[in-house]
Amino acid sequence: MYIERLLKVIKAPHVSEKSSIALDKNNVIVLKVVNYVTKQDIRHAVCMLFSVKIKKINVLMVSGKSKGQRYNLGYRCNWKKAYVILKRGYTVDLMNMEQ
């Protein structure tokens, strides 16, 4: 049960210009994660899936934007982003990761 929960923690890598620069310069991977997880869950999931050692994890909630089309106003969902700082000597290739 616990292993199944850890496999559902990471939704996808967050690919942006800022995240690719952080990966190149500071060895930081940026992930979209499920809203209810803690730093410890993210740590266990990343260590288990990628076989790396983690130095630090920063987590933040990204608020959904309001989007409208003519007279209809809607909102995008809130989501959680995790910045995972890896120890020296460890790398993760997120671009060639299979779903």
UniProtKB/Swiss-Prot annotation:
One of its GO terms (biological process) is translation. It comes from the Bacteria. SUPFAM superfamilies: Ribosomal proteins S24e, L23 and L15e. GO terms for cellular component: ribonucleoprotein complex; ribosome. Keywords: Ribonucleoprotein, Ribosomal protein, RNA-binding, rRNA-binding. One of its GO terms (molecular function) is structural constituent of ribosome. Belongs to the universal ribosomal protein uL23 family. One of the early assembly proteins it binds 23S rRNA. One of the proteins that surrounds the polypeptide exit tunnel on the outside of the ribosome. Forms the main docking site for trigger factor binding to the ribosome. Part of the 50S ribosomal subunit. Contacts protein L29, and trigger factor when it is bound to the ribosome. This is Large ribosomal subunit protein uL23. The lineage of its organism: Bacteria, Pseudomonadati, Pseudomonadota, Gammaproteobacteria, Enterobacterales.
